[in-house]
Amino acid sequence: MASGYVYDPRHALHTHAQAPESAARLEGLMTYLQDQRALEGLVKLPVEPIPWSWIAAAHCGHYVETVRRLAEAGRARISVDTYLTPAAPAVARLGASSAVVATQAVLEGKVTNAFSLMRPPGHHAKSTQAMGYCIFNNVAIAAFYALREHGLKRVMIVDIDAHHGNGTEEIFYGSDEVLVISFHQHPWFPGTGDWYHSGAEAGLGYNYNIALPTWSNDQSYRLAFKEIVLPLAERYQPELILVSAGFDAHWLDHAAVLGLSGQGYYDLVAGLRALADQLCQGRLVLVLEGGYNLRSLGAGVVAALRALTGEPAPPDPLGPSPNPPVAPVGPGLTYLKGLMPFMRSPREPGFFDQPVEVPYQTK
């Protein structure tokens, strides 16, 4: 079965020429993907707007109506760092719909896995607040869709954007239906995502922040993946893996100060695909988040698509990061390991009894 992708040119109706997050960003990416023939052999999934009630699963109804009302009134911004246009509600709805369409196609067995190549991004959007170019939280809406419309009990979200997915964390902080793992630079925008923010009430032990030091590179990510993501996934036994796929952790992207490479992105997605293959029938959906340097965005997305389809890693046109990490990631990982017993496992006996094997080496 083939992999799928979602793209719709209507995203360009909502844009701002001076903003890093604009239509030009995604249009430039799609031109690069076509030049590289990266979408050949993939199934293009058509998208139509989902009901507003599905969006309100992640956002309170008052917030959704506020977005629509402010856009109709001609407001230029909904937050200090998130612009509005008259088309913003419809385009943000389409972005959320694309994540749902990709998830639906995977859950219904139409494609093996899928990538939603749409904008605006979503992982900073909280239940009642826009932030960081994000209006609706696409990956959270897709998770609620899987839980409510398909009856899933356990969804795992892995956020690989350079910035902490504070909106996703806030929406699921008290829930044990969704395991949230975020790789991000810390301290950095939006200022949240410390190691010790681990969930509350029923969600205690279901929120993991892999807070990475400046210039953390491929090796740092590999270590964190092995020490945290693998045992968590094995313990949690997800029925679906959703990925907030941000590409601004690349060393060439100045939206952050991290050191991931194109090869590093390939390894991350290949590792997640292997987890999905072993734990949840291959159910894996990537949802585009950040990535503002067109060269590194293109290289990262091509690498991710190759990993999704099971092809070998492409040549990395930009190479590895020239900068060493300023600090090791290990001490924080030790803390996160201590949280794992708080998460209930559907498997008996406990965790670490049958380690998952994935093609992701630490050296």
What are these regions (language model features)?
Residues 1-57:
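N-terminal low-complexity, Ser/Thr- and acidic-residue-enriched intrinsically disordered segments
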Residues 1-6, 11-14, 65-363:
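A general "terminal functional-core" signal
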Residues 48-72:
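Charged, often glycine-rich, active-site loop that binds/positions anionic groups
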